[in-house]
Structures are given as C-alpha cells and as structure tokens.
Amino acid sequence: MKFLLNSIPTISFFIFYKFYDIFIASFSLMIASLFTFIITSILFNSINKHDLINLIFVIVFGFLTLFYHNSSYIKWKVTIIYFLISIVFLINYLFIKNNLLNIIFKNTIQLSKNVWRKLSLFWSIFFLICAVSNTYIILYFSEQTWVTFKIFGLTILTLIAVIINGFYIYFLKSKIIQ
C-alpha cells in the first residue's frame, strides 16, 4: 500500500506534464508529495526519514523551478538525490562497520557482513549510474525525453537492480542451504 501511495506524486507529475507543462507538473509534484507524506505518516503512525528528506527536496527544487520559471531545478533534483544516495552507500561501504542495508533489512534478510558490503557497493554504483544518466539526458535531450526517462527509464532501471539483488541473495541463500 505504501508503494502505491508513494507512486501518487510521480503519476501526478507525469499526467500534469502531459496535459500542461513542466511548471504545472512541478507544482502538482509538490502538492502530491506533501499529501502523500501526510497520509503515509498518519496511516503508518510514524514519520519516515527517507520520505521527509524526499519531500524537502521536492519542495525546495519545485519552489526554485516555479520561482525562477526554470525547469533545470526540478531536473537536477534527481541527479543530486541519486548522487547523494550513491555517496552515502559508498561511505557506508568504505568506512562504517554497521552496514546501512543490514540495518534496514535486519529483520527480513540474514546475510554476512561481506555480502552486505558488496550490496552497498552495488547500490552505490547503481545510484551513481542513475545520476550520470540523468545528467546526460538533461544535457543532450529534450525536456519531454527527460520526463519519459525520469518516469519510466529510472523506474525500470531500479526494478532491474532490485531483481538482480534478489537473484544474488537467492543464489547465496540456496548455496548455503546445499
């Protein structure tokens, strides 16, 4: 259910972009993100830090987009977020003993520290690739192509990364059982 609620801002952005323009779409993204944040906080009786950080980025970059009437801000938001996530996973991989992924999934998946480290490196590289890809699309393609890439391309890339992780974990778990 949370996944569906969190999809509302993206769907809203896409629909308003198709019928209006990036500025109306950015405003709808801001409103839908705030609405979704409030609803999920009430339904799940807690404030998710990830959702709060995302909301702050959406509001700040959405406001800048509207205030300066410049779509670059909303486009670069994606690159900045993915780059920061990549850095967090890289720092976690290199310097921190308590692996971030292990902390997140500690009640769900039991893996060795070495495997958690490899997964952190994988996600660091993945988010860096997404940041670089978004930058490339911003610089060399039309706004419409960027919107399509943001909505569908990055979603598909993320789904592929999750599937790869799932197969990797399944392979490791089945190897341990045998």
Curated annotation (Swiss-Prot):
Q: Which gene encodes it?
A: yciB
Q: Which residues cross the membrane?
A: 22-42, 52-72, 76-96, 121-141, 151-171
User: Which PANTHER family does the record match to this protein?
Assistant: INNER MEMBRANE-SPANNING PROTEIN YCIB, INTRACELLULAR SEPTATION PROTEIN A-RELATED
The entry's family comment says: Belongs to the YciB family.
Membrane topology note: Multi-pass membrane protein
Organism field: Buchnera aphidicola subsp. Baizongia pistaciae (strain Bp)
Q: Where in the cell is it found?
A: Cell membrane
- What is the protein named? Membrane-spanning protein YciB
- Annotated function: Plays a role in cell envelope biogenesis, maintenance of cell envelope integrity and membrane homeostasis.
